[in-house]
Amino acid sequence: MLRSQTCGELRISDVNKEVTLCGWVARVRDKGGMIWVDLRDRYGMTQLILEEGKSSAELLETSRKLGREFVIRATGNVIERVAKNPKMPTGDIEVKITALTILNESKTPPFLIEDETDGGDETRMKYRYLDLRRDAVRKNLELRHKVSRETRTYLDANNFLEVETPVLIKSTPEGARDFVVPSRMNPGQFYALPQSPQTFKQLLMVAGFDRYFQIVKCFRDEDLRADRQPEFTQIDCEMSFVEQEDILNMFEGLVRHLFKTVKEFDLPEVPRMLFADAMKYYGSDKPDIRFGMKFVELTDIVQSQGFQVFDEANLVVGINAEGCAEYTRKEIDALTEFVKRPQVGAKGMVWVRYAADGTLKSSVDKFYSADDLKKIAERFNAKPGDLMLILSGNGNKVRGQLNDLRLEIGSRLGLRPKDKFAALWVIDFPLLEFGEEEQRWFAMHHPFTSPKDIDAFMKLPFDQLGSVNANAYDLVINGVEVGGGSIRIYDRTVQNKMFEVLGFTEEEAKAQFGFLLEAFEYGAPPHAGLAFGFDRLCSIFGGVDSIRDFIAFPKNNSGRDVMIDSPSVIDDKQLKELSIDVKVADKGRIGIPNIIEETFNVKRDTSKDDHNITAN
């Protein structure tokens, strides 16, 4: 070994020891008579010292050649520091150098390798190997490792087997486009990279592996939005001979284990909420329950008073911002402008102020008497000091707008701290949703989700299938969907019916999923599962919004790896071997002709998926 200790382990008890350290030079301070070198490695930082008149001339000369990020090997004696640094674990000691070797020099880095860096995102992504030297980034990857390790510990203790599933699979598009891989041995044919191991884990259940898991890379070729990655990681799980309650208990146990071991936080028992209630009271299928402000419907008591905006709305609904009656007009106007932003889309906002003296005043006093305002306040269960904020319009749309307002108010009031955690199971999703434009049914989750009432699903008329609920569940933490899954269909007749409802012909279903349908004829057990968004889970534990901070080598928001310049053009020889002709569609992009894009019959708002799970 080139070193005897790391740069993070020496303490006052090590004084008088001779040690050898290796690492990167963080900074050099030359005060003439004294030279200090801060040496950094993955484990921490240690201060090295040389002294004019006591250190050899050769050592002093070598030390004065050092620059930022030089790799060195230093041998010396541990001594007690005169000016201790309580902010450093090694701050009680320093190493008086007796030998110094430069193992490698370094160009001047393009940004400061410090917790507070001056490097922009693109620069840090281009030089990611330098960014990874920063303590903040290193800690994120250590946390990711810990989450991975503790996941395996819990699942192994519960008799789960970690089984790897194929990466080169058949293209069965699952809500987004597949990444396709040409087959040289089979000209004109393509593999796809998996968006999820969905069908393979179901086949493992058919094979008798009753408890499976995998921490697995998945891929989705979709239009990128902020904080999305074309490749992402799932904790993918499946169980046989279970009901929904068994799944919820098992994986609530996993999440509580992770909070305990990773965050040293005792997560309370996770409550359950019906999808219908989540939408009614929070306007979202992933409500943030760290704070209250449930929606209150007012339609029946505010219409027919001459206020046209309310009279023409099919829903009038609001929230009570407790203790906010002292908001200035400027602050209220700022909230009005917030809801009128294109991203929210409301036309305006009505407010009712319940002053500390008990009087009520609103932005629509012209239409509502004091008694009317009192009825509104009573409906909100408001008290003096509260501020009621009201939106109106189309039902589903206005609930979404009020959800945005609720979260904004919660953030402004400090009710959504990163170190506070509230988890929630959302259950009983609709099985299907009807696309008015396409005039057909789409699966709310995916086509392998079992109806809660199978008999009703099989017997109801086509136009009444919207009343059937799914045996599906999502885990939400702090308003972020971190995982989800379902009880699976395991009977071929039911699965065929699902494909039929979704608009598949018998031939299309057989071509895409014939292998699964056939497997169901060989004794498929009842089974269920879910997948957690591993990257998103790590970001929640780390208290940051970006999943990119927890991925060693992420892509940028354009799906590019600017460090290795990928994706890139491949040479003509490779294309010829693959029997592919390439047509340049526009600058910087290539198109492969004669590949028909197929759309999988899943309709879900993936713009609001936080962890890139398409099938789980």
UniProtKB/Swiss-Prot annotation:
Known EC number: 6.1.1.12
Residues involved in ATP binding: 220-222, 229, 481, 533-536
Positions of transmembrane segments: none
InterPro entries documented for this protein: Aa-tRNA-synt_II, aa-tRNA-synth_II, aa-tRNA-synth_II/BPL/LPL, Asp-tRNA-ligase_1, Asp-tRNA-ligase_1_N, Asp/Asn-tRNA-synth_IIb, AspRS_core, GAD-like_sf
A GO term, aspect molecular function: ATP binding
Keyword annotations from UniProtKB, A to Z: Aminoacyl-tRNA synthetase, ATP-binding, Cytoplasm, Ligase, Nucleotide-binding, Protein biosynthesis
Main subcellular location of this protein, as a coarse class: cytoplasm
Subcellular location: Cytoplasm
Domain of life of the native organism: Bacteria
Region (Aspartate): 198-201
Pfam families registered for this protein in UniProt: GAD, tRNA-synt_2, tRNA_anti-codon
Gene Ontology terms describing biological process: aspartyl-tRNA aminoacylation
Binding site for L-aspartate: 174, 220, 445, 488
Catalyzed chemical reaction(s): tRNA(Asp) + L-aspartate + ATP = L-aspartyl-tRNA(Asp) + AMP + diphosphate
GO cellular component, one term: cytoplasm
PANTHER family in the cross-refs: ASPARTATE--TRNA LIGASE, MITOCHONDRIAL (PTHR22594:SF5), ASPARTYL/LYSYL-TRNA SYNTHETASE (PTHR22594)
Family named by the database record: Belongs to the class-II aminoacyl-tRNA synthetase family. Type 1 subfamily.
Self-association and partners: Homodimer.
Function: Catalyzes the attachment of L-aspartate to tRNA(Asp) in a two-step reaction: L-aspartate is first activated by ATP to form Asp-AMP and then transferred to the acceptor end of tRNA(Asp).
Protein name per the record: Aspartate--tRNA ligase
Species in which this protein is naturally found: Cytophaga hutchinsonii (strain ATCC 33406 / DSM 1761 / CIP 103989 / NBRC 15051 / NCIMB 9469 / D465)
Lineage, uppermost ranks: Bacteria, Pseudomonadati, Bacteroidota, Cytophagia, Cytophagales
Gene name linked to the record: aspS
